[in-house]
Swiss-Prot record:
Gene: SLC3A2
Phosphothreonine modifications at: 5
The protein's name: Amino acid transporter heavy chain SLC3A2
Species this chain originates from: Oryctolagus cuniculus (Rabbit)
Phosphoserine, modified sites: 2, 65, 307, 309, 426
Post-translational note: Phosphorylation on Ser-307 or Ser-309 and on Ser-426 by ecto-protein kinases favors heterotypic cell-cell interactions. N-glycosylated; N-glycosylation is crucial for trafficking and stability of SLC3A2 to the plasma membrane.
CC per GO annotation: anchoring junction; apical plasma membrane; basolateral plasma membrane; lysosomal membrane; melanosome; membrane; plasma membrane
Length: 529
């Protein structure tokens, strides 16, 4: 064995004995020291690599220095690359800007929205007899306030109330248009009701037909000047009280009606553009109706025009298109009479069809209380035809022969009821621009079919198809003579049907559109440029 080997062996033995001489806590200190040194322990030996680690570290790339980086960045290749990227960036930015300008310039212009008053945005709801509407012995303003929540669910925009003023039958002196009938309530109760209605976003229109309890609604022709003065004073009084509009009925019996209507409309308009005047007439003659409308373009007129002749699709198309063409730019109102119920003029099987019709024609639909549930005018024997008791629940039923599903409560729980249809149509009428103020185009379909398109600018289009007949019919609505902006597609989606059995959302081919008897369809399709 060589001398060097002997020395190494001695060092190994000393290293093996060294841990035995160390205290117990020295082991951890040694481990820490070895970890710091980067070595590993095996059988008491510590392997330390110093020179090799430093050489490896020196060989690793640490990046370019500032001077080296500037030198490389200034080389011709990198300079050309930077200029190319900068040029591409600005060319791309200018291209996107030019594209945006072209899109804006070539995009079709949006039509300017027409001026919309509150009565343009939804239906009006008439309550002429408070006691009959509430179906209780005490039909007063306080009780009517409790039904405002129900009116809110119908999404009507205005309540046509009364007449509720003091009227001594056929006695001008005993009639006070500024005083509320004590049986209905007091001025304070009316003010409270008015405030509650405004909180529900329901406008109140007061009926000021003077002699509503007498033989002639406007007294004698010789008293017309006195009555007209009373009406003018009443308009100013109730406008100051916060009423949103007025209705006067039977204006066909009023001497110089057009002259007085123009004067009364000037009073309401001078107070505020947001005040409404409604005139009612039982006339169905278009010439008489137009003579009344000529007095002022801001007048709503309810009449018996739509109920004048037999029920058929062809006849309804003629009446509607004739009326719209004759009134031109005048805002229309749609009803079947100035005060009566739908059931007084329409068979029960057509009630749903007429609801769809009135809600989708261009203008303001006007309904009487009970129209939403199909209330019959002869619900109670002996009651006046225009004052049937409203059927709220089973307690309102006049007899056991009347079904509970004719009540508000019964229909409220049925998604396929007439009441549910009324609410859905009222909701659609109030939120779709094409139904609010869109253009109207009637289509040629058949003798018992009436169909038309409602459209506005680039908004959703609506197609209404009504079958007034007693038999199933097939409508062919493919090609039509409509303007380009209102042309029909090959298919349209079903929004709702007056017959609950239809599956909503179904895409229907317009070339072969089958309808059941007395069925109405409301379809929609998107605007295509």
């Amino acid at each position: 064995m060589s001398q060097d080997t002997e020395v190494d062996m001695k060092e190994v033995e000393l290293n093996e004995l060294e841990p035995e001489k160390q205290p117990m806590n020295a082991a951890s200190e040694a481990a820490v020291a070895m970890a710091v040194a980067g070595g590993a322990e095996k059988n008491g030996l510590v392997k330390i690599k110093v020179a090799e680690d430093e050489a490896e570290a020196a060989a690793k790339f640490t990046g370019l220095s500032k001077e080296e980086l500037l030198k490389v960045a200034g080389s011709p290749g990198w300079v050309r690359t930077r200029w190319a990227l900068l040029l591409l960036f600005w060319l791309g930015w200018i291209g996107m800007l030019a594209g945006a300008v072209v899109i804006i310039v070539r995009a079709p212009r949006c039509r300017e929205l027409p001026v919309q008053r509150w009565w343009h945005k939804g239906a009006l709801y008439r309550v002429g007899d408070l006691q009959a509407f509430q179906a209780r012995d005490s039909g007063d303003l306080a009780g009517l306030k409790g039904h405002l929540d129900y009116l809110s669910t119908l999404k009507v925009k205005g309540l046509v109330l009364g007449p509720i003023h003091k009227n001594q039958e056929d006695d001008v002196a005993g009639t006070n248009l500024q005083e509320i009938n004590p049986a209905v309530g007091s001025k304070e109760e009316f003010d409270s009701f008015l405030q509650s209605a405004k909180k529900k976003s329901i406008r109140v229109i007061l009926d000021l037909t003077p002699n509503y309890l007498g033989q002639n609604s406007w007294f004698l022709p010789t008293q017309v000047d006195l009555v007209a003065t009373k009406v003018k004073d009443a308009l100013n009084f109730w406008l100051q009280a916060g009423v949103d509009g007025f209705q006067v009925r039977d204006v066909g019996n009023l001497t110089n009606a057009a002259l007085h209507l123009a004067e009364w409309r000037n009073i309401t308009k001078s107070f505020s553009e947001d005040r409404l005047l409604i005139a009612g007439t039982e006339s169905s003659d278009l010439h008489q109706i137009l003579s009344l409308l000529e007095s002022t373009k801001d007048l709503l007129l309810t009449s018996s025009y739509l109920s004048a002749s037999g029920v058929s699709g062809e006849n309804m198309k003629f009446l509607v298109t004739q009326y719209l063409n004759a009134t031109d730019s005048h805002w229309c109102s749609w009803s079947l009479s100035q005060a009566g119920l739908l059931t007084s003029f329409v068979p029960a099987q057509l009630l749903r069809l007429y609801q769809l019709l009135l809600f989708t024609l261009p203008g303001t639909p006007v309904f009487s209380y009970g129209d939403e549930i199909g209330l019959q005018a002869a619900a109670l024997p002996g009651e006046p035809a225009k004052a049937p008791v409203m059927l709220w629940d089973e307690s309102s039923l006049p007899s056991a022969s009347v079904s509970a599903n004719m009540t508000v409560k019964g229909q409220d729980e049925d998604s396929g009821s007439l009441l549910s249809l009324f609410r859905r149509l009222s909701d659609q009428r109030g939120k779709e621009r094409s139904l609010l103020h869109g253009d109207f185009h009637a289509l040629s379909t058949g003798s018992n079919l009436f169909s038309y398109v409602r459209h506005w600018d680039q908004n959703e289009r609506f197609l209404v198809v009504l079958n007034f007949g007693d038999e199933s019919l097939s409508a062919r609505l493919g090609a039509s003579s409509l303007p380009a902006g209102a042309s029909l597609p090959a298919r349209a989606d079903l929004l709702l049907s007056t017959h609950p059995g239809r599956e909503e959302g179904t895409s229907l081919a317009l070339e072969h559109l089958n309808l059941e008897p007395h069925e109405g369809l409301l379809l929609h399709f998107p605007y295509v440029a």
